[in-house]
Each structure stands twice: as C-alpha cells, then as structure tokens.
C-alpha cells in the first residue's frame, strides 16, 4: 500500500474503459470475408438454430458475428460489413452483420424496422 507521500508524488493511475467490440479498433464498422457460415444453439433457457458467420476482418482479426433477420444469402467468401453489438444468448458472439450492404442482401418482405434489416421501401 502506498504512503500518503507516494500518492502525492505519483497519484493513482486510472484503469480506463474496456471496449465491448475490440476487433473493430474504434471504428464504427469493419469489412470482412466470411470464412464459415453455420448455425448454433443458444444458452440454457432458449432454444433455436441461430445463424452465425465466422468473419476475417481487414485488420486480420477473425470474429464470430450474428446474421440478423429471416433468411440470408451468405456463404463462404461473401464480403460483409460488421458492426458491434452482442447477442445475449450466444456466448462469444459480439458482432452483427449489417444487412443490405456489400454481399449481404436485405431481408425480403420486411415491412417494419426496415432500416435495421436493409429492406427497401415497398412500392
């Protein structure tokens, strides 16, 4: 434990914030290439087959990201844009794929919350 004098001379060092999406390296989104597209099951009280993709980012980091919405066209070598945002019932999934950009098409037939799923306005 430091003495009062040592604290006066040096002070305490603040810890700093921990990033929730470290692979983005302070960028709002990052581009990447899908290395594997698969389904996985969620944690205990929930049951489903959640669609996820393993993505190698332009900075070389490989992350697991969630594919939101109903149905998708992603496969290996698809180029996608990822953003931060975890999926609470999938351990290790801390990123979301942005729908309607690059190789990922928007959700077909989506009427509500369209901007979140890259769906165009219906005519």
From Swiss-Prot:
Q: Does the keyword Aminoacyl-tRNA synthetase apply?
A: no
Q: Which GO terms describe its cellular component?
A: small ribosomal subunit
Q: Does the keyword rRNA-binding apply?
A: yes
A biological process from GO: translation
One Pfam family, please name it. Answer: Ribosom_S12_S23
PANTHER family xrefs = 30S RIBOSOMAL PROTEIN S12 FAMILY MEMBER
Known partners and oligomeric status: Part of the 30S ribosomal subunit. Contacts proteins S8 and S17. May interact with IF1 in the 30S initiation complex.
The entry's function note states: With S4 and S5 plays an important role in translational accuracy. Interacts with and stabilizes bases of the 16S rRNA that are involved in tRNA selection in the A site and with the mRNA backbone. Located at the interface of the 30S and 50S subunits, it traverses the body of the 30S subunit contacting proteins on the other side and probably holding the rRNA structure together. The combined cluster of proteins S8, S12 and S17 appears to hold together the shoulder and platform of the 30S subunit.
- Which family, according to UniProt? Belongs to the universal ribosomal protein uS12 family.
Q: What is this protein called?
A: Small ribosomal subunit protein uS12
Gene designation per UniProt = rpsL
């Amino acid at each position: 434990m430091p003495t009062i004098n040592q604290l006066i001379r040096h002070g305490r060092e603040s810890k700093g914030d921990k990033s929730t999406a470290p692979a983005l390296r302070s960028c709002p989104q990052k581009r990447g290439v899908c290395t594997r597209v698969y389904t996985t099951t969620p944690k205990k009280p929930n049951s489903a087959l959640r669609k996820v993709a393993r993505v190698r980012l332009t900075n070389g980091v490989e992350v697991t990201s969630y594919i939101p919405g109903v149905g998708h066209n992603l496969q290996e070598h698809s180029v996608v844009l990822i953003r931060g945002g975890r999926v609470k019932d999938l351990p290790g999934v801390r990123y979301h794929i942005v729908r309607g950009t690059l190789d990922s098409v928007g959700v077909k037939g989506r009427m509500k919350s369209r901007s979140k799923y890259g769906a165009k306005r219906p005519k």
